[in-house]
């Protein structure tokens, strides 16, 4: 993959491929992931498209977060 798609987080210090991440805007969902030992590779401030207000965007590694995502979809995470 081209280096232009790799980022290094100023928050976590982790390097990651942007195409191998998922964006989570739901704070409850992000907290549930972290409660289950899946931590974001990056966190950024963005603008919510609907409200126009600032929001946090949590970037998680797609593979690392797959199991907790499945549990989230099945209402198995709190």
Language-model-derived ranges and their functions:
Residues 1-2, 16, 25, 41, ...:
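Intrinsic-disorder/low-complexity regions
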Residues 1-5, 75-78:
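Short intrinsically disordered terminal tails
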Residues 4-38:
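N-terminal acidic leader/helix
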Residues 7, 17, 34, 40, ...:
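Compositionally biased, intrinsically disordered low-complexity regions enriched in proline and serine
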Residues 24, 39, 45, 73-78:
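Positively charged, low-complexity terminal tracts
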Residues 31-55, 59:
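Acidic, low-complexity, intrinsically disordered interaction modules
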Residues 48-78:
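Long, continuous compositionally biased terminal/linker segments
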């Amino acid at each position: 993959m081209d280096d232009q798609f790799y980022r290094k987080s100023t928050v976590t210090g982790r390097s990651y491929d942007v195409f191998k991440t998922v964006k989570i805007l739901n704070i409850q969902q992000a907290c549930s992931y972290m409660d289950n030992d899946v931590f974001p590779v990056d966190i950024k401030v963005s603008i919510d498209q609907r409200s126009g207000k600032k929001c946090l965007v949590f970037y998680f590694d797609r593979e690392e977060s797959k199991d907790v995502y499945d549990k989230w979809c099945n209402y198995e995470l709190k």
